Every structure is written in structure tokens, then in C-alpha cells.
A protein has these predicted regions:
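A generic structural signal for ordered secondary structure
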Residues: 28, 32, 40, 103, ...
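Structural signature of tandem-repeat unit edges
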Residues: 15, 38, 42-71, 78-97, ...
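Flexible coil/linker segments and helix-coil junctions enriched in charged and small residues
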Residues: 22, 26, 190, 235-237
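Consensus positions within tandem repeat domains that build extended binding/scaffold surfaces
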Residues: 74-76, 99-101, 125-128, 152-154, ...
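Leucine-rich repeat
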Residues: 130-132
Length: 268
């Protein structure tokens, strides 16, 4: 196990973290950290600590990192370039106050798959995504392999991707707040696959926040239509979207004028 100690990297910056009254500190490593490929660490796992932030790094293999002691990410990967197109990750802890596990990520491949395994997660936190190398193109696949207990701003400010595919089971989620919060996203598509909201008791209706125009949202799974109908009937944020809800092979599209779901076709 590799432990990253003080002064082992070129620069270490300490600054107070005050979000939500949290006055603890986090480390910021900048410049020269290249995933161990040039410092002889490439054969061992790199241990990450709670609150650590890696900035401006080239990440060749995210699976080489040990997240076992990380409880709050705090923009853990800030403006990092990711070179592989497949990751099988496992996070443990409460990520609600992270400010983003990945912040301004830059993918070197146009089509990236992230398999994100949730274990003991109360809140997933956020991906702040910017595909700087391939703007407005590519597809991000994110699979949540365990049930989400509390969803809070999972994806935010998705400038870079033409399509986001999110696979997950939200049937036991006790609350929703801004699962997607985006700006500058005209012409994009997000696909919610198996978006099962389960029992509506104690559910927060603010599922999406700051929604820009021309998103196509495809919802599949067992989501109660009534929940999304209330969202769409708001009339200020949702009914400019092309909503599609899939139930089995039936494909239902919400008519914002008639304010009702219309059977629009069948999936193969």
C-alpha cells in the first residue's frame, strides 16, 4: 500500500474547508502527480485520505486508488485528465458534502464507461463534468450497482457530453434533490434506465434543478407517472422537455399542452 505523505509531491496546499459549517482542512496536491507512472508507484495501490484533493493530474488507471478511508470527497479529482475508458469503482461513506467526487474531469476518450459501486452510501454527491478535450460529444455511462438511499445533485453542470446514460435503482431512496442540475446543455440527452422511485412517501419532488432547454430525457423502469406528472405540470422548469417514460415495452411521452401521458410507441 502506498501512502502519500507530506512533501512527497511537488506542492502541497492547505486551506480551510467551510462548506456547510465544516471547518476541517483538506489537502490539495497540484502539479507533477501523474498516477505513479513516472515516480515508480505504478505497481502498487495509492491510498487516498479523507478530504484529499488531486488537481491537474493525469489519471491513467483510477482502479489503482484505495478509497477505503475516504468519507467525504471534496472535489477529490479536480481538473484531472482520465485516459482509460472503463472504471470499476467502489465508494464507501457519506458523500453528501463532497462538492463533487469528480470536478471538471477531462476524458481522453469520447465514450467513457464508469461502473460506480455504491456501498453504505447515504448520499452520492456530485459529478461536476466538463469534457474539455471533446466538448459537446461522447457518451458517459454511469452504473450504480447498489440502491441509492438519498440522491442529491448527482450530476451537475454537464457541459461536455452529448448523452449521459444513468443506470440505477432508486426504489429505496428517501429523498430526491437535483439528481441532475445542468446549464449550457442544449441538444443533449440523458437516459435514466431503471429509474425506480418506489414508494412516493417522503419523496422530495425537486428531482431536477436549473434545467436548460432542449434536453431529451428518457425514463425507463417502474417510476410512478404521478410523480413526474406533478413535476411536469409545474409549467416553469419541466414542460419544455421531451419526456419519455418507459413501462415494460410501452413508451409514453408527456404532452405538456394536454398535460397527460400519451402512448407513443413500443420498444423492441
Amino acid at each position: 500500500m502506498i501512502k502519500i505523505e507530506k512533501n512527497t509531491l511537488q506542492q502541497e496546499v492547505w486551506f480551510p474547508r467551510t462548506e456547510r459549517g465544516n471547518n476541517t482542512f483538506r489537502k490539495t496536491y497540484q502539479d507533477g502527480f501523474d498516477d505513479g507512472y513516472q515516480d515508480g508507484l505504478s505497481s502498487s495501490k495509492i491510498k487516498l485520505y479523507d478530504g484529499m484533493q488531486l488537481a491537474y493530474s493525469d489519471i491513467y488507471d483510477l482502479n489503482r486508488y484505495d478509497f477505503s478511508d475516504v468519507k467525504s470527497g471534496g472535489n477529490m479529482f479536480y481538473n484531472c485528465r482520465f485516459y482509460n475508458d472503463y472504471y470499476d469503482l467502489s465508494f464507501v461513506g457519506d458523500w453528501n458534502d463532497t462538492g463533487g467526487i469528480f470536478s471538471r474531469i477531462r476524458l481522453k476518450n469520447r465514450d467513457t464507461t464508469m461502473i460506480v459501486k455504491l456501498r453504505e452510501i447515504r448520499s452520492f454527491g456530485a459529478f461536476y463534468v466538463v469534457d474539455a478535450d471533446y466538448p459537446n460529444s461522447g457518451t458517459l455511462h454511469c452504473t450504480l450497482t447498489e440502491k441509492v438511499k438519498d440522491a442529491y445533485m448527482m450530476f451537475s453542470y454537464n457541459y461536455g457530453f452529448g448523452t449521459i446514460n444513468l443506470y440505477g435503482d432508486f426504489s429505496e431512496c428517501t429523498g430526491f434533490r437535483e439528481i441532475v442540475n445542468w446549464i449550457n446543455s442544449d441538444g443533449k440527452t440523458i437516459n435514466f434506465n431503471h429509474f425506480d422511485m418506489g414508494n412516493e412517501t417522503n419523496k422530495t419532488e425537486d428531482v431536477f434543478g436549473n434545467t436548460s432547454k432542449n434536453w431529451t430525457i428518457r425514463i425507463s423502469g417502474n417510476s410512478p407517472r404521478s410523480t413526474f406528472t406533478r413535476l411536469l405540470d409545474d409549467g416553469t422548469r419541466y414542460n419544455h422537455l421531451d419526456w419519455t417514460y418507459c413501462y415494460g415495452k410501452e413508451r409514453w411521452t408527456y404532452d405538456a399542452v394536454k398535460k397527460e401521458w400519451v402512448l407513443s410507441g413500443y420498444d423492441d
